[in-house]
């Protein structure tokens, strides 16, 4: 049968990324407390395409993914990328995996146990060398210092997302990043709180007001102090409870250039 993908293209325009996006797929993630955790990810797979080829072979991405169906994990990122380059005749390959990860937490006063969900990402790129970035999004509570200063009856507060991405030497647990970052807001959040817990959490947030700028600076101090982390970016978004808009701040730091 004719292979249209390998036919010549005369426009002389190379493509940086082409492939398949938003595949729902089961994966296994290392869990600090339970060894392994099974979850379902959204997967994106791309390669570059030389200017002289009309298209890439989309089915081969799925074939590669299926070949690793029992073993899609962090340590398989580079082998999968190598296989993508080889089977698709590419000079660079990109693999993005986003998944929910669950950590058991105890409420601060009652000790009630509940599972907290964190959105995590594995992003791998292989050209001449392999590059990997671990990402975690951590929800926290933020309470406005200005509102606290001005108001006689309290202060506006809201849920915030702190998103960190790190490169590292050695190994970094997802749990480590969550623990580092949860303390950077006015208060962590929990799935389950009893009345005594709610009192503790709201009072803690009130006593620990943070602007979005404070949050990214606190996160920067925490990430910079971690010996294994070599590069990081941190973003904070406050979903303002008294505004239509969000407040946002971001910092990126390469410790290798310090």
UniProtKB/Swiss-Prot annotation:
Keyword set, alphabetical order: Hydrolase
The answer to whether keyword Nucleotide-binding applies is no
Q: Name one GO biological process term.
A: tetrahydrofolate biosynthetic process
Q: Where is this site: May be catalytically important?
A: 144
Q: What is its EC number?
A: 3.5.4.16
List, alphabetically, the Pfam families matched.
GCHY-1 (PF02649)
Task: Kindly indicate whether the keyword Nucleus belongs to this entry.
Answer: no
Domain of life, per lineage: Bacteria
Task: Describe which pathway this protein belongs to, using the record's wording.
Answer: Cofactor biosynthesis; 7,8-dihydroneopterin triphosphate biosynthesis; 7,8-dihydroneopterin triphosphate from GTP: step 1/1
- Reactions accelerated catalytically: GTP + H2O = 7,8-dihydroneopterin 3'-triphosphate + formate + H(+)
Q: Can you list the disulfide-bonded cysteine pairs?
A: none
The family database entries (Gene3D superfamilies) matched by this protein are listed as: Urate Oxidase
Picking any one GO molecular function of the record gives: GTP cyclohydrolase activity
Q: Which family does it belong to?
A: Belongs to the GTP cyclohydrolase IV family.
Q: Which HAMAP family match?
A: GTP_cyclohydrol_B (MF_01527_B)
Function field: Converts GTP to 7,8-dihydroneopterin triphosphate.
Please name the NCBIfam families in this protein's record: PRK13674.1-1
Q: What name appears for this protein in its UniProt entry?
A: GTP cyclohydrolase FolE2
Q: Which gene encodes it?
A: folE2
């Amino acid at each position: 049968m004719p292979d249209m993908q390998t036919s010549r293209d005369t426009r002389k325009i190379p493509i940086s990324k082409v492939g398949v996006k938003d595949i729902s797929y089961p994966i296994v993630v290392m869990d600090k407390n339970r060894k392994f955790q099974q979850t379902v990810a959204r997967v994106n797979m791309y390669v570059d395409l030389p200017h002289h080829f009309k298209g890439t072979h989309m089915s081969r991405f799925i074939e590669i993914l299926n070949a690793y169906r029992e073993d899609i994990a962090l340590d398989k990122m580079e082998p999968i990328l190598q296989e993508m380059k080889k089977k698709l005749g590419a000079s660079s390959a990109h693999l993005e995996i986003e998944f929910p990860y669950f950590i058991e937490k105890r409420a601060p006063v009652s000790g009630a146990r509940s599972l907290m969900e964190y959105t995590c990402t594995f992003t791998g790129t292989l050209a001449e060398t392999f590059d990997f970035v671990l990402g975690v999004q951590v929800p926290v509570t933020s309470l406005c210092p200005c509102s606290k200063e001005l108001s006689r009856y309290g202060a506006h507060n809201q849920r915030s997302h702190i998103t960190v991405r790190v490169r590292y030497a050695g190994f970094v647990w997802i749990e480590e990043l969550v623990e580092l970052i949860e303390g950077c807001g006015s208060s962590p959040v929990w799935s389950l709180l009893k009345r005594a817990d709610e009192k503790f959490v709201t009072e803690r947030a009130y006593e620990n007001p943070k602007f979005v700028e404070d949050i990214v600076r606190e996160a920067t101090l925490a990430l910079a102090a971690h010996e294994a982390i070599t590069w990081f970016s941190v973003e904070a978004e406050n979903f303002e409870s008294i505004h239509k808009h969000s407040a946002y701040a971001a910092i990126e730091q390469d410790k290798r250039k310090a």
